[in-house]
Amino acid sequence: MDEFDLIHSITPRTIHHSSVDVGIGDDAALYTAKHGVQEIVCVDTMVEDVHFKLHYSSPEDIGYKALAVNISDIAAMGGIPKFYLVSLAVPSKWTESEIKAMYEGMNELAKLYHMDLIGGDTVSTADKLVVTVTVIGEIEKGQACLRSLAKPNDIVFVTGEIGSSAAGLSLLLEETNPQNSSVETDYFIHRHKRPEPRVSVGRLCSIFKRAALNDVSDGLASELNEIAEASCVSIEIVESMLPIHSDLPKLHPNWKEWALFGGEDFELTGTVSNEEWEVLKQECAALHLPITKIGYVREKTKSKVILKTDQTSMILEKKGYNHFK
């Protein structure tokens, strides 16, 4: 593999943003920032056999998801994703065509959001594939949807469905063997491999006077605990309100673990005032964006998340995916 041939092959033929002054081909990229906006920068790393396995992930799948998880972080701030940079540590067994396919997976998603690839780096490694993606976005000044903005009496919501990605991973790892042949296993696998960042919902939330957001990367319980801690409030959610796919309980009797702690759904969860919830709900319905009320923000007290069932209440611990546990 020739590094310069690879750089030439992945260099975009078109640029979506006129603010890009220098893209791929120099020591660094240059772009002109807009007046009146704040820049958002996020980075995530995916490591072979930690975040994905090659026997069930194609190069395109790996590239797509590596970019998607970063776009989801931009969405959780209420922002617009604009640029991305890619750093790869590639084992020698990988071919140039496989690396190009990984970039194609990223490009497939980038085109949906009119994002420009503006740089990166590629090195060889004797061990596992490592993919690091940095995304740069923007948000109107003062409009970021911070975790610290939840207040008592807010409505708590989540987009889409929760638990589907964890179910998909369990199917891929053959930890789950559905007894019911009617279960849509391909749907759950797709949700794990190809998450859909909720940029449109984040943008809707950014127009409100106040909204707290977090993306469901490590699990709903973990993300809501982060909001509760940052805002110094308690959050109460209702089990019967949680949005799940109708087939999820058919896959495993302990499906609630997937829904609450599974993670990697990359949905958005957050809080808005009661008045703004009505607006958000209507706007999402008009755009066919799934969103569900799941609870309320309670008093400013010791930060905790409570799950209410028909008969009981329990505190949801801040657990989910943790790289160091």
From Swiss-Prot:
The biological pathway it contributes to is: Cofactor biosynthesis; thiamine diphosphate biosynthesis; thiamine diphosphate from thiamine phosphate: step 1/1
Q: Write out the catalysed reaction.
A: thiamine phosphate + ATP = thiamine diphosphate + ADP
Keyword match Metal-binding: yes
Key words of the record: ATP-binding, Kinase, Magnesium, Metal-binding, Nucleotide-binding, Thiamine biosynthesis, Transferase
Residues the entry annotates as binding Mg(2+) 1: 44, 121
Question: For this UniProt entry, which segments traverse the membrane?
Answer: none
Q: Detail which positions bind substrate.
A: 51, 264, 321
Which InterPro entries does this entry report, sorted A to Z? Answer: PurM-like_C_dom, PurM-like_C_sf, PurM-like_N, PurM-like_N_sf, ThiL-like
For the ligand (Mg(2+) 3), the binding residues are: 27, 73, 215
Q: Name one Pfam family in it.
A: AIRS
Tell me the superkingdom of the source.
Bacteria
UniProt GO MF annotations: ATP binding; magnesium ion binding; thiamine-phosphate kinase activity
Q: Which residues take part in binding Mg(2+) 2?
A: 44, 73
- List residues binding Mg(2+) 5: 218
Q: Which CDD domains match?
A: ThiL
Identify the residues that bind Mg(2+) 4. 27, 73
Example GO BP: thiamine biosynthetic process
Question: Where do the annotations place ATP binding?
Answer: 103, 120-121, 147, 217
- Which EC numbers does the record give? 2.7.4.16
Q: What does this protein do?
A: Catalyzes the ATP-dependent phosphorylation of thiamine-monophosphate (TMP) to form thiamine-pyrophosphate (TPP), the active form of vitamin B1.
Q: Which family does it belong to?
A: Belongs to the thiamine-monophosphate kinase family.
Q: What else is known?
A: Reaction mechanism of ThiL seems to utilize a direct, inline transfer of the gamma-phosphate of ATP to TMP rather than a phosphorylated enzyme intermediate.
Name of this chain's protein? Thiamine-monophosphate kinase
